[in-house]
């Protein structure tokens, strides 16, 4: 049984032992490293070298946004993109697949230069692949590299460029609108006939060309068609441009008249000519004294239908002049510069994507022009003032497995190709004299510096084993003794000799891998830390975890490492290799790798193994809905707090949600190394800092934990529920661990001060400390459900079902709560959820309790690492992944159809959506698909509210903030519907600020029914308590609600009279003994709810409105008191009463927390205050300040970009919902008018008399 199967079996075994399961979340801000600077060129499999920033922008349009906050943006690609990548085991360059692209903020970079003259800038924590003297390829952080280390660099690149046919088509595309293509008579007639069959006018309209119909027809008739029009025409009529390439002529369209038509040369000749012109050209002139080259040029020109003359001048080099069309073609295809050619030449995509034969001809042309064969250096060289061109030429040579090095001198740069192996593969020369010199050079060429394999001779001795040295070749002992360094050639000789004497085995295979020419091992000559302010980029290559960039092998971040190590909990070295159950092989039957971060691991504690299911929790306020759903699935949470910054506001928000769901916390204080090395705090000061953080967390637990757990759940150093450390460096410490190992806090300080944190990570690995804490202090499902069920399940905990749930009984009735629904193109809807009781099985018929429909389970699975593995069944206490549940929603209860359990309550979220966008399909035929997608998105994310208007085609989507809505829009686009999205619209509230004691009458349209109401504000303490989730009236019995309302300050009589609650609005029945009232009460409630959804001022939702029904006259005949009579009557009374009670507009507010260097404090406060914001608090920590501000949501659009500019990228900021405040008086009228006009209402808001008087009165 392989490793993967063993681990899968271990997972399956542990999932049946609930006492050994821990379902946990991490409450933290995720930091990400391992990135490259924007200018870094990534070597794609299609042949291109693309800057990291440009590649990110290109690929994000082909992906799905999976994460976005102030510091990080991540996209999952719909189709992976090929890139050159290193298979570390075989030491071969292969094609890897980019699956995700990342953009992050960085404030520091490390620049690394190696011996071939190339350099790269990465983040300090980025890991390079380094050849260890032991022969192993190991990982080493950028900021730990030393001069003399040998980095693994590429010598070979994957090239899957254009075929010759594709190249010919691309030529026409690039010639574009600046060239006419002249078709031979026969082809011209054929094209014209095809066009006539389609209809000239219809074709002209379809192509949407920028010329008149007559001109279009004229071009077709004459067979002289603009190249860009021909490209579109060929696609529309089914013509193959590649077939036309050899038959047509082209002319350049100048401002005055077109140039003389010429034929296109054969592709290889075209590239050779381009290489010559890049070397010796000056726009339309080629200056070169070689008669052989002159002869080649004349031949190529003749093939193009040109006759060129060689101009010879005394004392000067001979020159050939070309007509204007030739340099114009080179400009269109190769970006050949008109002026300052030497400085401006570059290698473009047309060249990098060309067939290898063509690229080889370009290199030959360039070296024929400017190259030199240097006998003294045993090298071929070429010199240019353009460093960028030579660096790209270096990468072009790697397509032929040719190593080269770059040197600077006297204002120019020289590229050298040396060493027998590279010279042999070098494309060579057409020029006979240089070709002959190269031939002679190769006869005596030896190995170059770039062919070194810097491993210890001791490795050879170990591989040789018992074979005596006398059986090896002469001078072999010099290699084994280390007197002579190994090269690839000498290593090959060693390997073949060892094989000849019968040596075999894994060690020998490893030597063979190191002798391959796919990579070279280059010495580090410079490591320099540089300050930086801006974005960095990463590209996830899932199988090989690296990609080729700038000639380096760049190690990248895997998603599973990121979820764990990035969240600051698991050491990076162990996350991928030992701890996480992550495997390179892909199971064909697996449905999806869940990006909601359900990751599992097995951890050993005191000799027992435990299955730990980690559910990642987003940190951004825009995703608070995701946090709540994650908290529903877990029993415990690791709260990560930065030692420097303290408890961040969003950490507090998430912890509050966790405690409300009865999730038990433990505390990890992160970045302790910064207190020691940066802030240089004394042990006493550090202790005070820790006590402050622990006290703050315990204060929240005291305030928000269930009464019976307020003391038990408090965290403390003594019992080990608090740990300290640095996730960045991978170490952690706790009191029990210190007692067990003898490590003291004094040792910790010394390790940090002496820059030995890596050694500390070996002594005290963070994963060991944190996961020990998890197993010891956080509950298993059986323990947790005993006290959680009464909070999260509305049924009677003492009933049979309640007891089954509390016991987490796998043999009881099925109850699974769906917390997340994702769409997978292979598996369909994948529902992830917590199984609270019973067992869910493949093929089982189940009942969706909230939707009241039956469906059948197709597959079930659990998580192993980040992957889903199939099992026959998943028992209670586990996180299950289920396919086949059609139309399932996040929050749904999955149960048995014969005897369904009472559904769990709908998941509650604190924040109501505050921002809305209008979404419209650009193409009307996409409307049904858009509606389907919007329904699906509402399923996946219950915090999204969608209003669909199938008549107008415009749909309103409301979310938690600007970022949230951007992500929703992107999800729609990536599912194939092109949409128009309006500017974000703020969702205001309407509230009353006075009391209307007068009984306001509302008459029904038939005048047979009258309702009398009073209106006043709900007590603000009650409104805030509901908004903060302290209680939910919809979950409570009438008696419970009555007591709670009185507790928060409502009058007893009012509390007893509450008939219904809509959000934070209350409808009270204060009538006594009214006949027929019970029969119309449902309609009165419906009218009240409609009025609260759309208030009188601007049809915005209401907040904190208390409506009391005090009297009524109701017609005895039911016919006269139906919905059409009662609902308008009560709404008119409510609206009239609200207007008399001084109704005003309320706007949503956000807290803004900005951490920034002190120098930028003024810029931040100015930015906040310029948005109608106020500064609430400023705290100082060293030279950093934390500014707390408050501003209206309406003013916060574009804040991310503006704050970044104002602070030059130095600000870290978060926002949090801050309730509602009255709109300033001077703005209110204008805002109401704008809202009403937007909704198609008359601009002026209504007056009380518009509702209080009789209809038509």
UniProtKB/Swiss-Prot annotation:
The record's Gene Ontology cellular component field reads: cytosol; ribonucleoprotein complex
- Residue span(s) of domain tr-type G: 541-782
Q: Does the keyword Lyase apply?
A: no
Modification Diphthamide, positions: 1120
Q: What processes in GO biological process is this protein linked to?
A: intein-mediated protein splicing; intron homing
Its post-translational modification remark reads:
This protein undergoes a protein self splicing that involves a post-translational excision of the intervening region (intein) followed by peptide ligation.
Q: Which GO terms describe its molecular function?
A: endonuclease activity; GTP binding; GTPase activity; translation elongation factor activity
Task: Give compartment(s).
Answer: Cytoplasm
Question: Is Cytoplasm among the key words of this record?
Answer: yes
Query: Its domain of life?
Result: Archaea
The UniProt entry, under InterPro entries, shows:
EFG_II, EFG_III/V, EFG_V-like, EFTu-like_2, G_TR_CS, Hint_dom_C, Hint_dom_N, Hint_dom_sf
Indicate which residues the UniProt annotation says bind GTP.
Answer: 616-620, 670-673
Q: What Pfam families is this protein classified in?
A: EFG_C, EFG_III, EFG_IV, GTP_EFTU, GTP_EFTU_D2, Intein_splicing, LAGLIDADG_3
User: Which Gene3D superfamilies does the entry link to?
Assistant: 3.30.230.10, 3.30.70.240, Elongation Factor G (Translational Gtpase), domain 3, Hedgehog/Intein (Hint) domain, Homing endonucleases, P-loop containing nucleotide triphosphate hydrolases, Translation factors
Q: Which UniProt keywords apply?
A: Autocatalytic cleavage, Cytoplasm, Elongation factor, Endonuclease, GTP-binding, Hydrolase, Intron homing, Nuclease, Nucleotide-binding, Protein biosynthesis, Protein splicing
Q: Where is the composition biased (Basic and acidic residues)?
A: 1237-1250
Q: What is its main location?
A: cytoplasm
Q: Where is the DOD-type homing endonuclease domain?
A: 273-402
Quote the PANTHER family the UniProt record gives.
ELONGATION FACTOR-LIKE GTPASE 1, TRANSLATION ELONGATION FACTOR-RELATED
What is the recorded function of this protein according to its Swiss-Prot or TrEMBL entry?
Answer: Catalyzes the GTP-dependent ribosomal translocation step during translation elongation. During this step, the ribosome changes from the pre-translocational (PRE) to the post-translocational (POST) state as the newly formed A-site-bound peptidyl-tRNA and P-site-bound deacylated tRNA move to the P and E sites, respectively. Catalyzes the coordinated movement of the two tRNA molecules, the mRNA and conformational changes in the ribosome.
Additional info? Answer: The intein interrupts the GTP-binding site.
Q: Which NCBIfam families match?
A: aEF-2 (TIGR00490), intein_Cterm (TIGR01443), intein_Nterm (TIGR01445), small_GTP (TIGR00231)
- Family note: Belongs to the TRAFAC class translation factor GTPase superfamily. Classic translation factor GTPase family. EF-G/EF-2 subfamily.
What name is this protein filed under?
A: Elongation factor 2
The protein's organism comes out as Methanopyrus kandleri (strain AV19 / DSM 6324 / JCM 9639 / NBRC 100938)
